[in-house]
Amino acid sequence: MTYFVFFLGICFVVGVLGVASNPSPYYGVVGLVLASVAGCGWLLSLGVSFVALVLFMVYFGGMLVVFVYSVALAAEPFPEA
């Protein structure tokens, strides 16, 4: 169980770094999804499954829709940083 929590922590940090290091939102979303899934998995491992489920549903139900809308408005897959 300790290795699983450590793995989720590493996935969360990698996801956050992936969001911070990508100038294009097309590729930053992969890190964002990885960080949210790892964070919800971390909450599940702590025993607060209802909170993890609610955060997962709210995030993927609302925040990802707003993100897709903003990506559609940006429409520049390879920006020059």
From Swiss-Prot:
Keyword match Zinc: no
GO CC annotation: mitochondrial membrane
Main location class: mitochondrion
One term of GO molecular function: NADH dehydrogenase (ubiquinone) activity
Pfam families: Oxidored_q3
Catalytic activity annotation: a ubiquinone + NADH + 5 H(+)(in) = a ubiquinol + NAD(+) + 4 H(+)(out)
Enzyme Commission no: 7.1.1.2
UniProt KW Mitochondrion keyword: yes
Segment forming the signal sequence: none
Domain of life of the native organism: Eukaryota
Its biological purpose: Core subunit of the mitochondrial membrane respiratory chain NADH dehydrogenase (Complex I) that is believed to belong to the minimal assembly required for catalysis. Complex I functions in the transfer of electrons from NADH to the respiratory chain. The immediate electron acceptor for the enzyme is believed to be ubiquinone.
Protein name: NADH-ubiquinone oxidoreductase chain 6
Origin organism lineage: Eukaryota, Metazoa, Chordata, Craniata, Vertebrata
Primary gene name: MT-ND6
